[in-house]
Amino acid sequence: MSAPTKRENDRARINEQITVPEVRLIDVDGNQAGIVSTREALRAAEESGLDLVEISPTAKPPVCRIMDYGKFLFELSKKQAEARKKQKQIQVKELKFRPTTEDGDYQVKLRNLIRFLNHGDKVKITLRFRGREMAHQELGMKILERLQADTADVAIVEQHAKREGRQLLMVLSPKKTK
């Protein structure tokens, strides 16, 4: 016999899969019926035409409930789908600048930057120096400071400008809106 897969371990045990001698039983209406033998609990589930489902296997004794297992799985999958739908995947977008970026290009990139922030994404700003431009890093810092000032109402600086090799990096994240 092979070892149970992770998927089988995640599923609740039902009916004859419950091997413990005693369980704490919750009936169809959600009322506690107390601690009964597993055999009695199975009989009660059969009489009501439903399944005996182990809700809390780690409790002493395990908690079991009489319910429709198919409906239980359906409700569980609906809850998980709803939780996944509500989760927002935060992405990090990257915008590349140069110390010689002209004003028209700057405005286009600024518009994109604000759009990314309004969508809830973080933005990594990379300012790349070439050749002798490294001697004038203050030009790059001015651009980053200007970006910071222009986005002050929609963004906060998550990572201040720092130098990595031939580039300056800064990360902006959207302000929390409530």
Swiss-Prot record:
It is found in: Cytoplasm. Its main location: cytoplasm. GO terms for biological process: ribosome disassembly. InterPro entries: T_IF-3_C_sf, T_IF-3_N_sf, Translation_initiation_fac3_CS, Translation_initiation_fac_3, Translation_initiation_fac_3_C, Translation_initiation_fac_3_N. One of its GO terms (cellular component) is membrane. Signal peptide: none annotated. HAMAP family: IF_3. IF-3 binds to the 30S ribosomal subunit and shifts the equilibrium between 70S ribosomes and their 50S and 30S subunits in favor of the free subunits, thus enhancing the availability of 30S subunits on which protein synthesis initiation begins. NCBIfam families: infC (TIGR00168). This is Translation initiation factor IF-3.
